[in-house]
């Protein structure tokens, strides 16, 4: 069995799990997430824990058991605590402003960039150069952060652009005469 799948997923207080065929639903304080479980993976609930095992012993089934365990663990963490990703804007005149479901970005283009946030994702701007992207779906939070960063990735000479808060930008030396 996969080493990841051997570890059970602990269900914190206030988190409910429901099975309907191959559909797994996780409900918590922050919302509900659903996942289609692969047919080769068996999920069992016992004593406030979810256990994952492969129905047959082949390599793909063991791999899917580990993948499913990781996805369900992220779902449980998302509906109980949520996920957030912090972005920083570095550059003269680079600004961000969150207005409802739209993130307005001034990134040095001749036009402002308006990014429509998908359902289930919120954005906050504690300052004009910081963006906090929050949600319960880890994949979606990371996807939105990557798309916003993609508008103006950090460049290696001056470091200008949109970067993750924990990102280290490798700098290059300017050309010498």
Curated annotation (Swiss-Prot):
Biological process (GO), any one: cytoplasmic translation
Stored InterPro entries: Ribosomal_uL6-like (IPR000702), Ribosomal_uL6-like_a/b-dom_sf (IPR036789), Ribosomal_uL6_a/b-dom (IPR020040), Ribosomal_uL6_bac-type (IPR019906), Ribosomal_uL6_CS (IPR002358)
SUPFAM superfamilies for this protein: Ribosomal protein L6 (SSF56053)
N-terminal signal peptide: none
SS bond partners: none
Tagged with keyword Ribosomal protein: yes
A molecular-function term among this protein's GO annotations: rRNA binding
Keyword Plastid: no
GO CC list: cytosolic large ribosomal subunit
Keywords of this entry: Ribonucleoprotein, Ribosomal protein, RNA-binding, rRNA-binding
Subunit and partners: Part of the 50S ribosomal subunit.
Family according to the record: Belongs to the universal ribosomal protein uL6 family.
Protein's job: This protein binds to the 23S rRNA, and is important in its secondary structure. It is located near the subunit interface in the base of the L7/L12 stalk, and near the tRNA binding site of the peptidyltransferase center.
NCBIfam families xref list: L6_bact (TIGR03654)
HAMAP family in alphabetical order: Ribosomal_uL6_B
Protein name: Large ribosomal subunit protein uL6
Organism annotation: Pseudomonas entomophila (strain L48)
Encoding gene per record: rplF
